[in-house]
């Protein structure tokens, strides 16, 4: 679960790029 929290933050930061947002979906 702790890993998920770290990933959430990671995706959140890169979400601005818009690239990883597509990968996350």
Swiss-Prot record:
Keywords: Alpha-amylase inhibitor, Carbohydrate metabolism, Chitin degradation, Glycosidase, Hydrolase, Polysaccharide degradation. This is Chitinolytic alpha-amylase inhibitor PvCAI. Signal peptide: none annotated. It comes from Phaseolus vulgaris. Alpha-amylase inhibitor, active against Z.subfasciatus alpha-amylase (ZSA) but not porcine pancreatic alpha-amylase (PPA). Has chitinase activity. One of its GO terms (molecular function) is endochitinase activity. Its EC number is 3.2.1.14. It catalyses: Random endo-hydrolysis of N-acetyl-beta-D-glucosaminide (1->4)-beta-linkages in chitin and chitodextrins. It comes from the Eukaryota. The keyword rRNA processing does not apply. The keyword Kinase does not apply. Homodimer. GO terms for biological process: chitin catabolic process; polysaccharide catabolic process. Belongs to the glycosyl hydrolase 18 family. Chitinase class II subfamily.
């Amino acid at each position: 679960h702790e890993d998920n929290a770290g990933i959430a933050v990671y995706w959140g930061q890169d979400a601005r790029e818009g690239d990883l947002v597509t990968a996350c979906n």
